[in-house]
Amino acid sequence: SIIREAQRLIRHPDFRGVISDLGGPTANMYAMGCGRNAASPCKVGQCLFPGVCASLETGHKAQIELLRAIRSLPGVKKAFVASGVRHDLVMADAKYGECYLEELVKHHISGQMKIAPEHTSVRVLDLMGKPGNECLIAFKDLFYRLTRKHGKKQFLTYYLMAAHPGCTLDDMQELKRFATSELRTNPEQVQIFTPLPSTRSAAMYHAGKDPCGKHHIFVEKDRLHRQRQKDVLTARAAIGKPRRPKP
């Protein structure tokens, strides 16, 4: 139980009232699951790509209740969700998604929240199995509308990736332009892709083929060229302040 774990943390002699991150790898998938019969095999195989599966129960109500329960515990001054929020799931939940994000803005963000679009090239996003830019922009606009509504000085930061299988230098230049013009940011949280065992991306890296194995894809393996992809993105550019949509 997360509540019991929080209670144990509160009893620790070094606890000072702040839970630094309730997020984890996928903060807002708490209590989500497949609405299909468990005995019935799934023919889709992916819950979140190319879109959120209609059978996935994406409601954020249970997590809203969890957050409220944790911050009501005696001894808890603040409980932050610093990372791990899947922005596509927030936007897919028409009933509770905005309420969940508003709950975060009001009570659970210390100043900035990190989300992980990873890229903006449609071709690279398809290989990653990640949602498109429309979802990202919609989430960004909603986030800043809510921060404006509640008078909060909060910001989004973006986790991005260089040299993923299929990603070229041109793709990184496209990502740089998007980050500068649409996200109004000079990216700093940039990782060079590392092929981890038993992952789909690692299979693409070693095989040089798309996930279905039907088409060859470009894979940058030269160390200096992989670093160059990152350097394109982290180079400083003159930008204005983040644009906040009108309420």
Region roles according to the model:
Residues 1-16, 135-142, 176-205, 209-213:
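C-terminal, active-site-flanking charged/polar segments
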Residues 4-157, 162-165:
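Conserved SAM/AdoMet-binding glycine-rich loop
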Residues 25, 132, 167, 176, ...:
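A broadly tuned "polar low-complexity/structure-edge" signature
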Residues 36, 96-98, 132, 173-175, ...:
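General N-terminal targeting signals
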Residues 45-54, 109-116, 143-150, 180-195, ...:
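Short, surface-exposed, charge-dense and proline/glycine-enriched linear segments
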Residues 63, 74, 117, 140, ...:
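Functionally constrained cores in energy, signaling, and assembly domains
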Residues 96-99, 163-182:
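Catalytic cores of alpha/beta
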Residues 170, 183-188, 193-247:
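C-terminal accessory regions of radical SAM enzymes
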